[in-house]
């Protein structure tokens, strides 16, 4: 009976492990799983049943593994013990164990081993054709530099050797060219100086001939301007005098009435006529001959229009 109970327990454990691995949402088993069911008539022989693993991540081995069945009909237990149910959050153990952590500086092992021709700096290995191209390019660049340097050195040496015998000829050619240039420069300079002198002489002659009429014209213009200035000054003075008189008349008219002024003028005229008549009578008494009014008016220089005197009739009008 004990053997049958152990077989049932192992089969249940296998079923529970399969269900836990297939369904992640299955409830986690408790730390102390229930004891396997036994028949009511069969007494339990094993006092210490095998305890399940406590941690979900690390499986614990049993201290007392169950004894294998002796009967030929009983199924034999598996070599690997059933894995305990794990939580969905806990990482399941992988078939291949994880590689140990390596330092960042340590080179990781590669699937393809590095070839012996690869560089120590960690560059990818190149195939045969690129390597040959690089070698050719390097050799060509080195050879080009060396050729250029040799050419420079050879050119410098050739220039030094050629410059020594040809220096005198070059100096002679330069001196001849400078002399020819000086001669060419001096010839047009002389021609230009002669042309300048002739132009200056012609301009002086024409300038002297043109200066005389210009001076006479300027003198005439100055005289005309002076006369015009005098005429304008006189006109300005006359206008100012007329303006002054008009201002006086305006002032008198504003202060006095015109009718009053006319009456005053009439009174003054009558007084003047009376005075002339009295003088005529007095002077005629002193002298034997009688003096006329025209003689008195001419003697005193009085205007006939002011006194309203008529010379033809020798009488005052408007008396």
Swiss-Prot record:
Compositionally biased spans, kind Low complexity: 16-25
Gene Ontology annotations for the cellular component aspect, listed alphabetically: nucleus; Swi5-Sfr1 complex
Compartment annotation: Nucleus
Disulfide bonds: none
GO biological process: double-strand break repair via homologous recombination; positive regulation of DNA-templated transcription
Gene3D superfamilies to which the protein is assigned, alphabetical: 6.10.140.1020
Gene Ontology molecular function terms on file: transcription coactivator activity
Modified residues (Phosphoserine): 67, 71, 83, 87, 99, 103, 140, 143
Pro residues bias spans: 26-40, 65-116
Annotated coiled-coil segments of the chain: 220-270
InterPro entries: SFR1, SFR1/Mei5
Biased composition (Basic and acidic residues): 167-203
Job of this protein: Component of the SWI5-SFR1 complex, a complex required for double-strand break repair via homologous recombination. Acts as a transcriptional modulator for ESR1.
Name this protein carries in UniProt: Swi5-dependent recombination DNA repair protein 1 homolog
Source organism per UniProt: Mus musculus
């Amino acid at each position: 009976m004990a053997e049958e109970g152990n077989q049932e327990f192992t089969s249940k454990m296998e079923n529970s492990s399969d269900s836990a691995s297939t369904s992640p949402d299955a409830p986690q088993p408790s730390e102390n799983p229930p004891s396997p069911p036994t028949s009511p008539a069969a007494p339990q022989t094993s006092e210490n049943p095998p305890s399940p693993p406590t941690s979900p991540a690390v499986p614990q081995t049993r201290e007392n593994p169950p004894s294998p069945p002796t009967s030929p009909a009983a199924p034999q237990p598996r070599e690997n013990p059933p894995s305990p149910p794990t939580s969905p959050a806990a990482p399941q153990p992988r078939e291949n164990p994880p590689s140990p952590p390596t330092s960042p500086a340590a080179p990781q092992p590669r699937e393809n081993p590095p070839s012996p021709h690869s560089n120590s700096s960690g560059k990818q290995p190149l195939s045969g054709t690129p390597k040959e191209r690089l070698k050719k390019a390097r050799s060509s660049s080195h050879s080009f530099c060396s050729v250029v340097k040799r050419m420079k050195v050879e050119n410098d040496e050739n220039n030094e050797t050629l410059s020594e015998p040809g220096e005198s000829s070059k100096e002679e050619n330069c001196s001849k060219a400078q002399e020819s240039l000086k001669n060419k420069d001096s010839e047009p300079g002389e021609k230009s100086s002669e042309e300048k002198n002739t132009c200056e002489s012609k301009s002086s002659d024409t300038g002297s001939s043109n200066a005389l009429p210009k001076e006479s014209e300027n003198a005439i213009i100055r005289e005309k301007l002076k006369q015009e200035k005098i005429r304008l000054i006189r006109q300005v003075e006359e206008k100012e005098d007329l303006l002054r008189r008009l201002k006086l008349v305006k002032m008198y008219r504003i202060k006095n009435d015109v009718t009053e002024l006319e009456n005053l003028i009439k009174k003054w005229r009558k007084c003047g006529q009376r005075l002339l008549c009295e003088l005529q009578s007095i002077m005629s008494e002193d002298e034997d001959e009688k003096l006329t009014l025209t003689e008195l008016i001419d003697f005193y220089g009085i205007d006939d229009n002011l006194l309203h005197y008529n010379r033809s009739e020798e009488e005052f009008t408007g008396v």
